[in-house]
Amino acid sequence: MLQNIRIVLVETSHTGNMGSVARAMKTMGLTNLWLVNPLVKPDSQAIALAAGASDVIGNAQIVDTLDEALAGCSLVVGTSARSRTLPWPMLDPRECGLKSVAEGQHAPVALVFGRERVGLTNDELQKCHYHVAIAANPEYSSLNLAMAVQVIAYEVRMAWLAAQEQAQPAVEHEEAPYPLVDDLERFYDHLEQTLLATGFIRPNHPGQVMNKLRRLFTRARPESQELNILRGMLASIEQQNKGK
């Protein structure tokens, strides 16, 4: 199951951080590392700081875009240390671990970490179902990348160990199949095109409404069957609009 947990690093700028993250992952039983458009490629420093976790570095998936790293995932959680203008469903690290293990039993889960200096952009955070914030000392809350990964990875491992020790998993059981990130993005594209065609949103300012709708559907988290119903509704609206 732990192989289904992806640690995704976006535009990492120091190879030493890649190695330190790999070490933090492997100590908690995680090995699935994805690097999104890294500003430098893994090198000897990454291997040195991996300290026995060089296999995690060697097997890392390197992709150009975040969408590629999220493809096939049913749950995406992004790390965020700042309050945003558009509030989003939040988890603490323990909740993140529980939810990741529950859903990781059935489909890949992505835990996304941003750039060393500026974190994730708002656009990247809007691709996530939830945001997770680490409740560090408010007077000195600066965690480096590997520290943040270690905290989240530890909570994932604790949730996984609890599930192993119980006849019934000690995590929330996800009965309903949730759509993959790819399916959700197609739905958002379909929704935007339909709302543009009906004149509900303006072609030159679609973002504000679409961002709020993304937040709404992220909070509601429709199941796969429910998403298919929504897609059918949009198709029906399109047909009616064409007939006018």
From Swiss-Prot:
A molecular-function term among this protein's GO annotations: tRNA (cytidine(32)/uridine(32)-2'-O)-methyltransferase activity
Compartment(s) of residence: Cytoplasm
SUPFAM superfamilies cross-referenced by the UniProt entry: alpha/beta knot (SSF75217)
EC number: 2.1.1.200
Catalysed transformations (reactions): cytidine(32) in tRNA + S-adenosyl-L-methionine = 2'-O-methylcytidine(32) in tRNA + S-adenosyl-L-homocysteine + H(+); uridine(32) in tRNA + S-adenosyl-L-methionine = 2'-O-methyluridine(32) in tRNA + S-adenosyl-L-homocysteine + H(+)
Residues that hold S-adenosyl-L-methionine according to the record: 79-81, 114, 134, 141-143
Alphabetical UniProt keywords: Cytoplasm, Methyltransferase, S-adenosyl-L-methionine, Transferase, tRNA processing
Entry GO terms, CC: cytosol
GO biological process: tRNA nucleoside ribose methylation
A Pfam family it matches: SpoU_methylase
Domain of life: Bacteria
Top-level EC class as recorded in UniProt: transferase
InterPro entries cross-referenced by the UniProt entry: Alpha/beta_knot_MTases, RNA_MeTrfase_TrmJ/LasT, SpoU_MeTrfase, tRNA_m1G_MTases_N
Subunit structure: Homodimer.
Stated role: Catalyzes the formation of 2'O-methylated cytidine (Cm32) or 2'O-methylated uridine (Um32) at position 32 in tRNA.
Stated family: Belongs to the class IV-like SAM-binding methyltransferase superfamily. RNA methyltransferase TrmH family.
Protein name: tRNA (cytidine/uridine-2'-O-)-methyltransferase TrmJ
Organism: Klebsiella pneumoniae subsp. pneumoniae (strain ATCC 700721 / MGH 78578)
